[in-house]
Amino acid sequence: MEINKSYEPQNIEKKWYENSIKNGYFTPKKDKNKKPYTVLIPPPNVTGILHMGHVLNNTLQDVMIRYKRMTGVPTLWIPGVDHAGIATQNVVEKQLANDGKTRHDIGREKLVDRIWDWKEEKGGRIIEQLKQLGCSCDWTRERFTMDEGLSESVKEVFIQLHQKGLIYKGKRIINWCPRCVTALANDEVDHKDETGNLWNMNYPLKDGSGFITVATTRPETMLGDTAVAVHPDDERYKELIGKTVLLPFIEREIPIIADEYVEKDFGSGCVKITPAHDPNDFEVGQRHNLEKIIIMDEHGIMNEKAGKIFEGLTRFECREKIIEQLKAKDLLGEIEPHDHAVGHCYRCDTVIESYLSDQWFVKMEPMAKRAIEVVKSGEVQLQPKRWIKVYLHWMENIRDWCISRQIWWGHRIPAYYCDECGELIVAKETPVKCNQCGNTKFTQDEDVLDTWFSSWLWPFSTMGWPEKTEDLDYFLPTDLLVTAPGIIYLWVARMIMATLEFQDKIPFKTVLLHGMVLDETGMKMSKSLGNSPDPIHIIEEYGADALRFSMIFNTPKGADSYYSNSILDIGRNFANKIWNAYRFMMMNVEKIDGLPNKDELKLELADKWIYSRLNEVIRLTQKNYEELRLNDAANILMDFIWKEFCSWYLELSKDRIYNSEDKEGQLTAKYVLLDVFQTSMRLLQPIMPFITEEIWHGIKEYFPMPEESLVIAEFPKVDNNFIDEKIDKDMTLIQETITVIRTLRKQVNLAPKVEIEIFIK
């Protein structure tokens, strides 16, 4: 048997992955007598390429799928990609910009066609990269959030929620990105702590008796002020309530009103109210019937309502100009440094604007109630448990979800307006006739749905809903979702709500929330920071097994993972150690004819010890896999294979392997070596699927096993008859004695070949 001197992962990994695909090992066979184990991949963006976060996330999922597959249950891991509305449209719009064009130059239809062309040509590259990583998804079930089936699901859900009164359209203050020119949900806003200024501005009272001071971090919004509010119990301002002030520059008369929203002890105790550009001010405006004046356009450019001095300026240019003009008019008070959280677009990092706009919303509170109950009861388990409190806090304070986006790539809202009377009709297809006026011409709503609107249906839309399918009956609820805590609101909570609403089932039983991948300094890995390596380059240099093992080994359950080249060396060195042990073992056992039955073995202390340890390792490994403590499983397996099997048992067996005169002892050593090593490969296969498969097939030539592939081989079972604490203690004493002797020899520089007598007292 010819075995390469060094482990070369590239050819081996490709060979065995293609073998698994060819033989359909990743596609489950439904068995009504067995409960399946199902995992849904968090669909990566179609624009995405593999990064270290993907490596951790998908390796965690793959370890569990491979482990469960070996336990004999039907396993399903559904893959797919997300259409990623804003991100994907941005990619294609940048291409247009290189040609000196905008989306408006070519129109909606041509832009969408161009994005589909891009998707077919370059989108989904990450899927091929996940295959290189070794992900054992059922690729026959791959989905796309805008494929025909999922589009049908989206329309059906929108229509049903609208019929239930849970989807509505209305003017509300929303988060607006002037760069992406679209609304954003609250959870799509990244809040960053920044040090800015709190500007105190003096508004003159109309009667000329003085002025009132208001403070703001956004002076440009003063141009849309329609009131100044004070607390009704604030004695300082009671006499001013009902009076008016003149808004500087605009000269608009605005009232001084009383509202309990105002904090008496913050700043001057007077608050400027801008109903069209602040969510809290909007609520105050509703209570006091204030005018809502929009002072900037969708690009963040000041409009005619801002006044001639400021019209045409960007919002930040306007801010500077206002400060300059207030100083000139002696209306600028104290400027105080102020630390506050500033919202940024999660896609382009632009500072978002609070903006009054006509949008579509989902009422979330009615659906949140059951989603709270299933987590409180433990029906859906969030692990680690510390995330339960975070989840419940958000759900118990949930707000309506703005689902409309002012872009062209995505699921277009299935709502139509009669061209004659404006009647709104929500339907899957263009209506034939208006029920109100009989007109036959309609215009579809221009907006598309938030990307997450298709994603929250992922657990059941991927299984064929709204059709009644066997997959839905058999595989839902799924067993495990592995994701990052950053999308616990955006995705996890919404999937629970949607699946309960439309399936009357939970979407998954367990959610494993893992940490971030950080560099050696503790910084989050990011390509923009230049501290994130390309995982494909790592796979090409180290092999997928080494990368997978290193990430699992180094990531405690639910904790952040610290990445460095030295971490990668752990996986590579372990793979090399396994390979060298395999090569040495096979070079020697192939020279020994025959193989005894297990009941014919002449077991010595070392044999009994390694079997005792092996069965304890089987117990602990299975326990850790079941409890999702995958790094503990990796640590246990490396310790056993490297330190106990290679460093001790393999060395102790050499005398018998080389001793052809003791045939019985030689055959026993051969059997135990092959048996323990093939069992170890079974235990390690979920984490390192390729090197274990190669070695397992090599062992199979000398040690018959019934399975055709390690991917579908049986996971080892504990044999308690072999676990023996006395043998473990006896062997520990021998190991300690040998270690002491080796240390003494080294201290006196005694050559290894020199024999000495040992006296033990």
Residue ranges with predicted function:
Residues 1-52, 69, 75, 346, ...:
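Non-catalytic terminal extensions that flank enzyme cores
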Residues 15, 19-23, 93-211, 222, ...:
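Residue patterns forming the tRNA-binding/recognition surfaces of aminoacyl-tRNA synthetases
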Residues 31-41, 53-56, 60, 80, ...:
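Secondary-structure capping and boundary motifs in well-ordered enzyme cores
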Residues 31-92, 145, 154, 214-217, ...:
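N-terminal catalytic cores of NTP/NDP-binding nucleotidyl/phosphoryl-transfer enzymes
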Residues 82, 178, 185-190, 432, ...:
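Acidic, turn-prone loop/beta-hairpin segments
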Residues 199-203, 730-753:
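Polar, glycine-rich mid-to-C-terminal structural blocks
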Residues 260, 288-300, 407-410, 414-420, ...:
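Alpha-helical recognition segments enriched in aromatics with Gly/Pro capping
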Residues 545-589, 667-685, 746-753:
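Structural preference for alpha-helix termini/caps and helix-kink/transition segments
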